[in-house]
């Protein structure tokens, strides 16, 4: 056990947390266990109400669990059995709030220096540490400005600088990009990943955006109703989901109304509105009328007949900038439609939509 704690910057074991007490208690976390290794970024991903922000706040010391343990390095900061809980201000964690929570009447320098002053460091040391972290985040020339004089992206960097300035073992990020517009979000996502790699940070990040989680993190914990649904690398979560919930949350999919007509190992023979297709069974099993999905980008468009395909008329194409998203569907709505991507705008007509068996998942 001691070896695991040394390897891990953060260890959470069997954490339970309720809102309310007694008969009105609402379980939010239901036995969550996770770890964060040195230099690793873990994203807590999930829909609203899944428990991801509550887990982050429990680690920070801003929520009180009822059961389980939390350790930062070798130091226990919460133990439900011993009724021990270390106050948030003594956990030495860097926290970046969703709203950034900058003091409007303090300069950038003063905002970043605030935590160091609370720790009663000397003025010269504070000046050096703040100057160093501002330089690292590209804010060296903005030290005397106030928050209202900064862009959204610059405000975010100040919040990160404030969290990093006292060199915490773990930085906690609560929806760090959600307050930025689409263009700034893309730029900030790249900056945040570059900063994490360059400084070797250990970070736990909350997000509801799967693209953001995949781009920034080394590992994803997908939460569903207070439990970890699945965890793994971004690539494994996207390409080999264990459950329907994971498959649907991690990508853009087509759903097909299919009936199982036969099986051969993990290969499943399907009837989809008269078309005979082969798919791949995923998860613990599937019934006679399972949920069958395929990622939109895995659908191959052909003007001529191909194997494992459905023939449908083109209804419309939508221009997305780098590609077209095409919808194939009978105009009368008699069958479910399929979406597929194309580099070019397609001419009206009927097309064969090939659904590769290994990418047609049956749950």
Set out the residue ranges of the language-model regions.
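ABC ATPase nucleotide-binding domains
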Residues: 92-94, 98, 102-245
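Non-catalytic connector elements of ABC transporters
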Residues: 253, 263-363
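The feature captures the beta-strand-to-loop junction immediately N-terminal to the Walker
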Residues: 45-47
């Amino acid at each position: 056990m001691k070896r695991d704690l040394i390897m891990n910057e953060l260890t959470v074991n069997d954490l339970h947390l309720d809102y309310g007490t007694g008969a009105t208690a609402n379980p939010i976390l239901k036995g969550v266990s996770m770890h964060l290794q040195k230099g690793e970024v873990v994203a807590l991903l999930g829909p609203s109400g899944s428990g991801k922000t509550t887990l982050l706040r429990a680690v920070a010391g801003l929520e009180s669990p009822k059961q389980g343990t939390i350790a930062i390095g070798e130091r226990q900061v919460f133990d439900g059995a011993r009724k021990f809980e270390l106050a948030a201000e003594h956990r030495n964690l860097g926290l970046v709030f969703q709203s950034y929570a900058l003091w409007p009447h303090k300069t950038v320098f003063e905002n970043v220096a605030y935590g160091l002053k609370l720790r009663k460091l000397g003025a010269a040391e504070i000046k050096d540490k703040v100057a160093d972290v501002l330089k690292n985040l590209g804010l060296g020339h903005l030290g005397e400005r106030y928050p209202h004089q900064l862009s959204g992206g610059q405000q975010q960097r100040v919040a990160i600088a404030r969290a990093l300035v006292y060199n915490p073992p773990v930085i906690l990020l609560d929806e760090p990009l959600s307050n930025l517009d689409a263009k700034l979000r893309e730029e900030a996502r790249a900056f945040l990943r570059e900063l994490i790699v360059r400084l070797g940070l250990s970070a736990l990040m909350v997000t509801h955006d799967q693209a953001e989680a995949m781009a920034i993190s080394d590992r994803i914990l997908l939460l569903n109703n207070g439990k970890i649904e699945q965890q793994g690398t971004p690539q494994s979560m996207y390409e080999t989901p264990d459950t329907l919930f994971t498959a649907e949350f991690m990508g853009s999919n087509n759903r097909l109304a299919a009936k199982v007509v036969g099986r051969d190992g993990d290969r499943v023979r399907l009837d989809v509105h008269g078309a005979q297709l082969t798919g791949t069974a995923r998860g613990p099993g599937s019934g006679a009328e399972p949920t069958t999905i395929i990622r939109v980008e895995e659908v191959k468009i052909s003007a001529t007949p191909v194997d494992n395909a459905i023939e449908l008329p083109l209804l419309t194409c939508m221009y997305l900038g780098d590609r077209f998203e095409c919808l194939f569907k009978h105009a009368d709505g008699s069958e479910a439609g399929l979406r597929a991507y194309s580099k070019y705008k397609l001419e009206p007509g009927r097309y064969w939509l090939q659904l590769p068996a290994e990418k047609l998942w049956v749950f």
